[in-house]
């Protein structure tokens, strides 16, 4: 979980700095025949610019999501849940850093978005982490995979181990 989070958070930070340096004050840069564009947008709202101007709300929500996931994360015993939590935590943290430290003021900062696909709002790597990590969480939940790796139909692991009980193994 930690390695995934660090890799995404670092990638998000570096790519935002590149976007600020190379795309500021320029027209969108097209690549792949116009399929992918790089354009700099400062987003004061949530995903897809919903709730524009409610930065304090999104800042608070992101902080709560990170805290809850960090509190729950010690129970994770599978790579699937570790990767999904790492992606969501890093994505939320990447955009939270923008909200806390970018203009116009602390807690009111705008998120740096710079990736644009046709018929889609501009986004960044942190957004990709939140979306992909959330999709993995939903997929694992729908399949009944618990944080400890057991299925909802199995008995959970013994406390302090990753091994299922003998009864669950024999079923």
Give a label for each model feature.
Residues 1-171:
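Alpha-helical transmembrane bundles and membrane-interface segments of multipass inner-membrane proteins
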């Amino acid at each position: 979980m930690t390695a995934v989070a660090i890799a995404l958070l670092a990638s998000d930070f570096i790519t935002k700095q590149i976007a600020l340096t190379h795309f500021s004050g320029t027209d969108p840069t097209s690549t792949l025949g116009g399929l992918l564009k790089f354009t700099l947008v400062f987003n004061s709202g949530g995903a897809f610019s919903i709730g524009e101007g409610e930065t304090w709300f999104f800042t608070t929500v992101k902080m709560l999501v990170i805290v809850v996931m960090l509190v729950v994360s010690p129970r994770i015993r599978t790579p699937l849940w570790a990767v999904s939590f790492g992606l969501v935590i890093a994505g939320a943290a990447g955009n939270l850093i923008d909200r806390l430290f970018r203009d116009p003021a602390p807690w009111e900062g705008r998120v740096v978005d710079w990736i644009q696909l046709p018929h889609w709002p501009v986004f960044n790597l942190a957004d990709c982490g939140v979306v992909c990590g959330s999709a993995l969480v939903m997929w694992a939940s729908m399949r009944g995979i618990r944080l400890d790796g057991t299925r909802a139909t199995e008995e959970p692991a013994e406390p302090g181990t990753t091994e299922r009980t003998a009864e669950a193994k024999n079923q």
